[in-house]
Amino acid sequence: MENAPLYPAFGSGQTLALLRDHAAQGYFMAGSLAADTLLGVRDAGMLSCSEYAAHLRRMRLLTDKPIIADLQSGFGNPMNTYFATQELERSGANRLILSDQRYPAHTQDCPPIATDVDFLGKLHAALDAVDDENTQIWALLEGMPTQGLETTMAKLAWVDQLPIGGIVIAHWDREILMALTAMPHQHRLIATWQPNVPAFPGIDGWLDTGYLADTAGNWQRQLITNLPAELALPKEVLK
């Protein structure tokens, strides 16, 4: 992963506080982790834009580093995407990731994908809504499981022509990354991160989607499993 930064994901203030000493270039407030923190449900689609934005504003107070926000599939049509982008930027987002999922977006392995016309309209809406010239829109391509490599390559080609800040590739394997990174492209290619993934030529960054939270959660579950239901009183108390 040399020269390719890792963007750790968080959903809670506790996790973000632990990450503050990490030499990251930015942190990703994953919608799924935010929903897990607020509702106990690991599904980004359970949060409205206003709920997510309110949580983002609180998290913004905990760090000066860039925060990557989860724009999901725009929270509706292109008009909704426009106003959602404005709200999240004003709430402290420095980067906003827009998924090509069909609305409503949900955290799943094989999500239904929007039409190219719909996704293009939302990308333009998000780009038009940005107020700060330093704020970036990243396009998230999630169609590999349902659309295949050829369709994803065609989509990457036209998405790359837009004035976005990067393209995030999800649901990949090594062959997929080899094919996509071999394509001519002008924008940064970022892949969702998997544990123990080796450095990969052509990938400019890795986006964590919850490994840290999963590891911490497994540790907590183990502690709770081993927690005794009752504690014996000391003998001196029983006398």
Language model segments and positions:
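Alpha/beta enzyme core
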Residues: 1-66, 73-230
